[in-house]
């Protein structure tokens, strides 16, 4: 099994360098299905692979939605119909990718996790992928995805608060994405600002304890938290006139 595991990690690294992310994901799924605790590197390879696979489709969906709005405002009904059909194709792909990683997390990654750090990592991921579903789903499906996302982020936060330092990049990344969830999915800028500010302030207070190896990662996420706070605060002051679509929130 060790030889097979080593081979799949190598193939995943190779696929990443070749920017063949679908294959990167397949290699890492093979390791996840061995039901072993992943190393930090393996965990990151899973995350990077899926982030790229989903990221391309999320970008496509946003572009199509924007074009659809423009065509709608011009009254081009035929074009709007065409875009809707095309957008549905992208949504089907998004749904499939999210379902795939969510089942890997639930069936293999979380059950094999033995540390607080990896537990936070996987629950954060779970929150992220339910959030991506909530971005484009409607009605009950959106409500369900939002609720599942909230549950996963809350579970991650509970473990992060007890097991990880406020300056830990995974805890900071969780706060960043959880606050984006409040802002974009639950339309709650006040809650988003509170969460982001609390995470930022707690990290600042313990900056001395920042380890050298995570210094770059932690300070980068802190910068993103601050950027979002600036954007969201001005949004609140302007009474929500800030267009969320024009400027994407920083995410981890």
From Swiss-Prot:
SMART domains: 14_3_3. Transmembrane segments: none annotated. It comes from the Eukaryota. One of its GO terms (biological process) is protein localization. Pfam families: 14-3-3. Coiled coil: none annotated. One of its GO terms (cellular component) is cytoplasm. Homodimer. Belongs to the 14-3-3 family. This is 14-3-3 protein 7.
């Amino acid at each position: 099994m060790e030889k097979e595991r080593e081979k799949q990690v190598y193939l995943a690294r190779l696929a990443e360098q070749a920017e063949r992310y679908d294959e990167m994901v397949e290699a890492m799924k093979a390791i996840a299905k061995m039901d072993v605790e992943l190393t930090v590197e393996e965990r990151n390879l899973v995350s990077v692979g899926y982030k790229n696979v989903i990221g391309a489709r999320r970008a496509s969906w946003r572009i199509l939605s924007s074009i659809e709005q423009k065509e709608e405002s011009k009254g081009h009904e035929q074009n709007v119909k065409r875009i809707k059909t095309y957008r549905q194709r992208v949504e089907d792909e998004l749904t499939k990718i999210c379902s795939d990683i969510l089942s890997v997390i639930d069936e293999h990654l979380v059950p094999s996790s033995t540390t607080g750090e990896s537990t936070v990592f996987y629950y954060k991921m779970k929150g992220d992928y339910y959030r991506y579903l909530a971005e484009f789903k409607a009605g009950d499906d959106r409500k369900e995805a939002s609720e599942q996302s909230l549950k996963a982020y809350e579970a991650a936060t509970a473990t992060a608060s007890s097991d990880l330092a406020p300056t830990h990049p995974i805890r900071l990344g969780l706060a960043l994405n959880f606050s984006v969830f409040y802002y974009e999915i639950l339309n709650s800028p006040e809650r988003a600002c509170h969460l982001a500010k609390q995470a930022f302030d707690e990290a600042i207070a313990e900056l001395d304890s920042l380890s050298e190896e995570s210094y770059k990662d932690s300070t980068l996420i802190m910068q993103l938290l601050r950027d979002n706070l600036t954007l969201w605060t001005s949004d609140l002051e302007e009474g929500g006139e800030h267009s969320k679509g024009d400027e994407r929130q920083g995410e981890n």
